[in-house]
Amino acid sequence: VPKIPVKVVTFDEIVEWSRRLADKIRESGWQPDVVVAIARGGYVPARLLCDWLGVGDLLSIQVVHWPSAAEVAEKAYVKYPVNVDLSGKKVLIVDDIVDTGDSVELAKKSIEECCSPKEVRTAALQVITSVAKFMPDYYAIEVKEWVWFAYQWNAVEDAAGFIMKIVRETGKTEWCLDELLMTHLDWYGNEYVEKRFGYILYALDMLNRRGLVKVKKCRAD
């Protein structure tokens, strides 16, 4: 069993989940006038929902919550708010996944306070119900146990974050490549390493160039 369970998400799954989410919104009888993506994870799902729902107006708000892969900041905050007049508009806020729910809750409060919308509802592709303190109005998938979902749009960022998590927790900055890859298997599982192998190597090269990790090709003991 990996130390950190990771589910690698395909783009086909994203399209299917966004379609499922759009169906739930339509079935509720509610139609948004504007979609607001929570940057950065909400960009792709929000754009897909615009397509499924026939919405032409797409904005974004950035809420900072996760500093790196499988790490959590002490407190989420709005980094770049929306600052436009949305009077009379029905607004749908979209994120990729709701973990604690802090990001979605903050985005909703920010838009309600600064933009004067008629109504604000929230949506996410997935909700981890075991840890969520704020539930969105709509979601496609319920996740009952915590898993790190590795989406297509932050593959390099995840890979770099996972590498640096190993470095921080082991206190070791110099690695044999084979040894580091075996550690990845133990920590993150076969699926992640097999499907994201190229991204892991890319992130290793990037971190090596920045002087954060030193990797050499040698056989691990």
Where do the protein language model's features map onto the residues?
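PRPP-associated nucleotide enzymes
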Residues: 1-221
